[in-house]
Amino acid sequence: MKAAGTDTMKNEIKYEKSELELMTTYQLREICRREKIMNGVIHPLDKEELIQSIMRYMGKRQDFFICDKKKEGEERVEEFLKKTRIVIKPCKELYCQSQILAYEGLSIEYYDGYTIPYKKELSGTNAFLMGSDMTLCAILNLKEHGGRQEKLYLTKAAELETRETQRKDYRIFCMGRQTSESLYHLYYGEHTILPEHIEVYSIPLIDFVVRKPVTLMLPMAIDFGSVNTTAGVYLDSAYFENVGEQAAVKNCRENEINYTAFEDGNGESMLLPSVIGVLAVEEEDYKLLFGYDAIRLANASYVDEGFCVFYDVKRWIGEYEKEEEIVDRQGRRRLVKRAEILRRFFLYIIRKTENRFKCRISQVHISSPVKQKHYFRRMFREILPEYMTDQETMLDEGMAVLYNTISNMLEQETLEENEEYEALIIDCGGGTTDLCSYRFRIQDRRAAYKIYMETAYENGDTDFGGNNLTYRIMQVLKIALVRAKGNQNVSSVKEILEYMDTDIYRFIDSHGVKAFYQYLEQEYQKAEETLPTRFADFERYNRSEYYKVKNNFYTLFNTAEQIKKLFYGKVGALEVTVTSEQKEQRENTVLLDKWKLSFWKGNSLTVEKMIPEVMMNYFEIELLLSGEIYGIVQKFMEELYHSGRIQDFSFIKLTGQSCKIDLFKDALKEFVPGRMIQFRKRANIDAADFELKMTCVDGALKYLRDRKYGLADIHLNNGKAVLPYRINAYTHNGKEVVLVDGFKDWDTAGTISRNMEDLILPLYLKNTDGEEHCRFQYVCRQEDFSQKSYEEIEAVYGSHILQKETDSIENGDVKFFVWAEQEEWGFQVVPVYCEMDELYLGKAEFFSFESDNWVNSFFDGKK
């Protein structure tokens, strides 16, 4: 044996779970004693608990894949393979496709279809594609996929280089796990003992081709959602003429929209969870995980072990300049700007798309939120400048959905030329719900359609989305578990639902949504005493208890999300069972990790291994969610209904994944005839259904295609938005003054006066029902003022500060001018002071309507 470097690695024994499961309880205790795992020595643990303890501290890292670029790593491996003695092991049953096609800077994935027959000793190892002159042409990984043991997939990381040789004679060296791990450590420059000779299987390859990726003509489209994000590209004939015959592109559709698929652990999904996890925080950099990988990171953590996962990151748009503290499992911390984290998230999606379609993306169209379109576009310009497309032609989410509808109606020939149509679109996503009105008409010209589109924001709820529905299910799940564990102080789920089983719509009309859920909220708070989930309350406790409670919340919330998908992702799922025991294969079962939940026992939080089985049925969930859904529909539709405006609309379209729940359509029928509602729900829909979520990507790509190919001359216009907020203040004698009224003339400045001192002006953000959301403070100091003439003030602020208003300011007083900024989704405060009949202008300050200070988050540790 020979050593690479001067030191040798400590020879640690690591254990695989499959090996431990074959051992007796006595053998497992002996391992704990030998490895000084005190938890397994002191406490009388059973076999399952002993395996859990050993895997936590001495579990073997399953795979040592070479999957990122390391300086001089390939050179070290190539030099070793050239110099060492290689023994070829005979194995006729191992073979591969005769040719492998790779693309510069792109990965090879399982969907590319390169495989070898399954051989257990090769699973989870590295393989080395060599030229006849022993040039290292590519480093590959051998992976299982989908739990099937029929074949192993050849994959390659995008960061690793590929090269051809002059002679078309290649072979793939496959080797056992121990040899593969040795070369892994050699590649990364770690001190390791290298063998004098290695044994490999040699699989011949006729050709290895490396090509340059095709650059797409049209931008890629991304729909960034609160819960899920989707992406797609339009692949024209030119793409198919230039790309190679990869297995991945054989399934692509020519001159059609193709979606980016993401691996979810069980297969592929067109939906990527908008979740970001922290894998490692190092001195020079940090590593993040995205989507399903981030969720797996949280699920894989031990119950009292730290993890850092960000959900609902779309809310960061409003304050993307802020910093977030990221923490890895080792407790290493770092402050990182939200903009940088979001940039990496979008780059991950772009890279996944490039790898999937063997292409290069030069431009990206990300549909902006309707109410924050200008703010979002500025953020996009800053974080992804290299992918910028023409911002003036970028669609917001509502426009994209509408254009998809128009395009489909043109194909079906159901639109009348020059007739003006009005549409109302309700977009209920994972975190927010928006209501927008649209007007459009078309003209069929000789060369192209001429399409006129106008949009106006009508209403919205920052605090309602699919997460609200998941949270309601989580509340019932938590109460059911607490009752099953013996806490009879909490009412049963049956008792709670019986209380709610009334004429729901009329009850909410009279008493509101909060009153409808009052009993549920009361019992949920009682359940906190047994099964805590408010991890923010544990920040002053020790680290172990904090993470136990944090695990409680995320375990229950993710389980509730699975339950929701089973009920509303499958027709006929009338009952769902939640259990920790994997018994016989039962349909509609959600497995709850028995090592994840901690209950109060006396003064300590104890992990419960025996989790009681809980059953939920469809009718209970319908009753539970009806109040939330009717409440949001009533909020949006009631004013339109009573004013008669609802009759002006040609159709009402429901979009967003949450809208596939029939309860939305039922609630809408209280205000409009059912035939006005465009509600897509197909028979035999399953959990992978994503049609409602894809309408935004479809519309954006059809819009980009029609503009690029001259099929349509499209004119976009933004109408005046309705702002669902009011800004109020109080005069010196306590009289309330409305400074900004979002449902009226909100772009005219409201004013309020004070006597000039170093003063603080409190401002109150209220919703249309008069409920206070947030308080702002404008701090006014004399040194911030500078003398200005009215003409100078007018040059800066125009009609927002009128001369008749400044003329009325008395000496010694300051008048505050407050007006809304639609494009920035916030409001400005500008003070003007008068002294000795001279005007002095103070500093302007902008406040965002929606900020972290008041917007409801289900992931802040207060649920």
What would you call each of these model-derived segments?
Residues 2-68:
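Basic helix-extension-helix modules of the SAP/HeH family
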Residues 24, 349-363, 633-651:
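Phosphate/pyrophosphate-binding loops at sites that engage ATP/ADP/AMP, CoA/4′-phosphopantetheine
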Residues 65-191, 485-505, 678-807:
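Acidic, glycine/GT-rich loop-and beta-edge segments that sit at the periphery of enzyme/chaperone cores
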Residues 68-182, 250-364, 368, 478, ...:
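Phosphate-binding loop and its immediate beta->loop->alpha context
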Residues 192-217, 393-426, 693-711:
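Conserved phosphate-binding catalytic cores of ATP/NTP-utilizing and phosphoryl-transfer enzymes
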Residues 209-242, 305-308, 314-315, 410-454, ...:
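Gly/Thr-rich phosphate-binding beta-strand-loop-beta motif of the actin/hexokinase/Hsp70
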Residues 237-271, 446-459, 680-685:
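Flexible phosphate/Mg2+-sensing switch loops adjacent to catalytic phosphate-binding sites
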Residues 342, 470-475, 479, 485, ...:
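Helical "lid/coupling" subdomains associated with nucleotide-phosphate turnover
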